Amino acid sequence: MRITLPSGTPAEIDLSVANPVMGLVIMPDIFGMRPLFDDLVAQLAREWNMAVIAVEPFPNQTLSADIAERMACVPLLSDDAVLRDMHEAADALGVARVGLMGFCMGGMYCHKEARSDRFARISSF
């Protein structure tokens, strides 16, 4: 289900698991939210018994699938805003223990987030 974080950033969330063992925030790659990540959120929630959310890395932007266009937008991202969105996403899950998983560019943000103690586990691909 699509939600909007308090910051205004869209996210895909699955809270269908009755008693999740923990939560998981997913940071997509440079191509952002798309059906692949919508499906991954649902699959990991179901298979790993977790509350899961994925966050759009380029909120308020309409970008094509062109890699050059997206690469040009990366320097415009605010690390503080992306890290804030990750924390807001974790809060939206409603569980105490939350892990973080990032893919490519999202993995870079996992490494940046490692300096905080918000996430119990961090995995970067």
Predicted segments, located by residue:
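Primarily recognizes the serine-hydrolase "nucleophile elbow" in alpha/beta-hydrolase
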Residues: A89-F125
